[in-house]
Amino acid sequence: MIKVVKGDITKFRAEAIVNAANKYLEHGGGVAYAIAKAAAGDVREYIRISKEAMREQLGKDWIDHGEVVVTPPLQLEKNGVKYVIHTVGPYCGGSWDEDKKSKLKLAILGALKKADELGVKSIAFPAISAGIYGCPLEKVVETFVEVVKEFLPSAKSLREVFLVLYSQEDYEKALKIVGQGGV
C-alpha cells in the first residue's frame, strides 16, 4: 500500500524513515538536516555517526545512486522508528530526463530493498530530490509510485509505504497523482 501523508517526517510513525541525503552524508539542509537534528539534537554528531556507518557498511566515503546507509534512529525511536535509511537522489536543478529518473528509481529501490531486508513493515519517504535538488515534484511522485508498485508484490515484510510531504501545496500535488485512498 502506498499512501500520501501531509506532515513532518521527523515525527512520522514508521519502522523506517528514509533520508534524502547528499552523497557524503553531510546533512547540511532540507529534510536531511531536519532528520539529523531530530535524531541526535546535534547535527554534527549525526553527521559523524552517519559517516562512520557509511565507512563500515560501504567501505568508502560516499554513496552512489542505489546504495544506502543505515543509521540508528536515536531520539526518533520514540516515534517507533527503528532505522534511518540514507539514500541519494539525482540533482535536477529544475530539469528532468531519463538519466535523472533512472537515478531516482535506484535511490528509491535501494531504500525499499534495505527496509525489506531489515524486516520492517512500514517505511516513510520524503519526496527524494524534489526539495533543494530541484527535481519536479510531479515527476518524483510518479517515479516513486512506479517503483513502489513494482517492488511491493515481491516484498517479504514491507507492507506500508508512505510518502510524507511537509507543505500543503506539495501534499495536494502528490494527492492528485496517487489519489485520496493511496494505491
Curated annotation (Swiss-Prot):
Species in which this protein is naturally found: Pyrococcus furiosus (strain ATCC 43587 / DSM 3638 / JCM 8422 / Vc1)
NCBIfam families linked to this entry: PRK00431.1-3 (NF001662)
Domain Macro: 1-182
Name of one Pfam family that matches: Macro
SMART domains: A1pp
Official protein name in the record: Uncharacterized protein PF1536
SUPFAM superfamilies documented for this protein: Macro domain-like
InterPro entries according to UniProt: Macro_dom, Macro_dom-like
Superkingdom to which the source organism belongs: Archaea
